[in-house]
Swiss-Prot record:
Gene3D superfamilies: 1.20.1250.10. Disulfide bonds join 27-135, 48-85, 70-105. The keyword Glycoprotein applies. GO terms for cellular component: extracellular space. It is found in: Secreted. Glycans are attached at residue 62. Participates in at least several B-cell activation processes as well as of other cell types. It is a costimulator of DNA-synthesis. It induces the expression of class II MHC molecules on resting B-cells. It enhances both secretion and cell surface expression of IgE and IgG1. It also regulates the expression of the low affinity Fc receptor for IgE (CD23) on both lymphocytes and monocytes. Positively regulates IL31RA expression in macrophages. Stimulates autophagy in dendritic cells by interfering with mTORC1 signaling and through the induction of RUFY4. Keywords: B-cell activation, Cytokine, Disulfide bond, Glycoprotein, Growth factor, Secreted, Signal. Coiled coil: none annotated. It comes from Bubalus carabanensis. This is Interleukin-4.
């Protein structure tokens, strides 16, 4: 027996509503995981936290949030691929940021001022907490 014509719009509406709920919930989970990792990293006393990184937040005003997250990911990869400390946390953070970032971006280290890994992570944590409060 086929579906009645009155039932089809109801099912479509339920499908759309469920899809919207799942996507919104994913945002919360990813951001919460990023914030949790950042909390762990920023409380660690580790010499790697003083490593110099490009100040990716000192980008032009027209830089999108996705481009900024992409640039942060590039700096994190540069650190955890060339140093043996904090690889697990930085790698996980990079993977989670990748889901929020644009696929291509560049960091011009010659023109960019430097900061420390700890400063970068602290600023990222502030941004993520603000983003989480709006999600």
């Amino acid at each position: 027996m086929g579906l009645t014509y009155q039932l089809i719009p109801v099912l479509v509406c339920l499908l759309v509503c469920t899809s919207h709920f799942v996507h919104g919930h994913k945002c919360d989970i990813t951001l919460a995981e990023i914030i949790k990792t950042l909390n762990i990293l920023t409380t660690r006393k580790n010499s790697c936290m003083e490593l110099p990184v490009a100040d990716v937040f000192a980008a032009p005003k027209n830089t999108t949030e996705k481009e900024t997250f992409c640039r942060v990911g590039i700096e994190l990869r540069r650190i955890y691929r060339s140093h043996t400390c904090l690889n697990k946390f930085l790698g996980g953070l990079d993977r989670n940021l990748n889901s929020l970032a644009s696929k291509t971006c560049s960091v011009n280290e010659a023109k960019t001022s430097t900061s420390t890994l700890k400063d970068l992570l602290e600023r990222l944590k502030t941004i993520m907490k603000e983003k989480y409060s709006k999600c």
